[in-house]
Design a protein with these regions (language model features):
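C-terminal hydrophobic helical "lid"/dimerization subdomain
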Residues: 171, 194-197, 246-304
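Adenosine-nucleotide cofactor-binding segment
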Residues: 98-106, 118-191
Length: 304
């Protein structure tokens, strides 16, 4: 979790923390603990690969007994997905004015983005791009209307789904006129960022969920020409839910408790901690192992 003003012991919170958006804290280098944006990136807190870590009481959430551990372990990334989709759908109890969305990437975040849209009863069309067949299958189960593989006919496939038209310039990738009303880039690579801009309808919105680093070869002319809105989606905070502000984590837990979202097939591999090498390999080579989310079982100290 983000290390905002409250965690840092700062009495007068910055304007972002004051509104509950601790992921955008202005004071990540000051306060009672060392500099760092999140747990795991601060020497005073340690992180998930340490023998132990430190958490502030505001970062602790009670998981209801009727939510299984395999679902609870996904509350944090589900919160990130919920935070992201509201940038497009707005207040989730209002009828969506976004007819179509494209989700690029069907790893954990892409699949959870689809699940989150389905959980809030998004009434538009969801098209996803999945690299592996097992990801495509799960994307459809979670609510995607159509899933495409990133092959040589990708542009033609997406144009046929969105009613757009592609034109091949003398140099470079195709130009797309029309497209999806909103695109969620859940990969964040140079190629996917460039494609996201091209696949999005004029005056549409691109939400960057995957960490983009320093992209190369992205044609920003598309942003200018199509007047696109491009926004990042980092972590979580406070959201407008049923016309009231709620912490994203609490909302995610409530959706799971009410069975509004089924993540039972997201955790595909469970390992004891002692088998960490095989666990890491399974997580890295997704296509070979047909893995989605790989987790450790720490419930039995004898096997951990």
């Amino acid at each position: 979790p983000a290390l905002g003003c409250t965690v840092r012991g700062i009495d007068a919170p910055c304007r972002n923390c004051n509104t509950g958006n601790v992921g955008n804290c202005d004071n990540i280098t000051t306060g009672d603990i060392s500099a760092g944006v999140q747990t795991g990136y601060c020497r005073d807190t340690s992180g998930g690969w340490s023998d132990s870590l430190v958490a502030h009481q505001t970062q602790i959430h009670i998981v209801p007994d009727d939510i299984p551990n395999t679902a609870a372990v996904l509350v944090e990334p589900l919160s990130c997905a919920l935070h992201a989709i509201l940038k497009v759908t707005g207040n989730h109890d209002a009828e969506s004015t976004t007819p179509s969305v494209l989700v690029i990437g069907c790893g954990t975040m892409g699949l959870l983005t689809i699940a989150a849209l389905n959980a809030i009863n998004f009434n538009g069309t969801i098209v996803a791009i999945a690299k592996h067949p097992h990801q495509a299958e799960l994307a459809k189960k979670l609510g995607a209307n159509d899933v495409i593989t990133p092959q040589t006919t990708l542009y033609a496939d997406l144009c046929s789904r969105s009613g757009a038209a592609q034109y091949q310039p003398e140099v470079g990738k195709p130009t797309v006129l029309g497209g999806f009303d909103a695109t969620f880039d859940c990969v964040g690579s140079s190629d996917t960022l460039d494609d996201a801009l091209r696949f999005t309808q004029a005056r549409g919105q691109v939400v960057v969920i995957g960490m983009p680093a320093i992209p190369k070869g992205v044609d920003w002319t598309t942003i200018w020409f199509k007047e696109l809105r491009v926004s990042g989606a980092y972590a979580y905070g406070m959201e407008m839910v049923n016309s009231e502000n709620r912490r994203t984590f609490e909302w995610a837990l409530n959706l799971l408790k009410e069975r509004r979202v089924d993540l039972s097939e997201m955790v595909t591999h469970i390992f004891p901690l002692a088998d960490y090498r095989r666990a890491v390999g399974t997580a890295i080579f997704t296509g070979h192992h047909k893995s989605v989310k790989t987790v450790f079982d720490l419930s039995d100290p004898c096997t951990s």
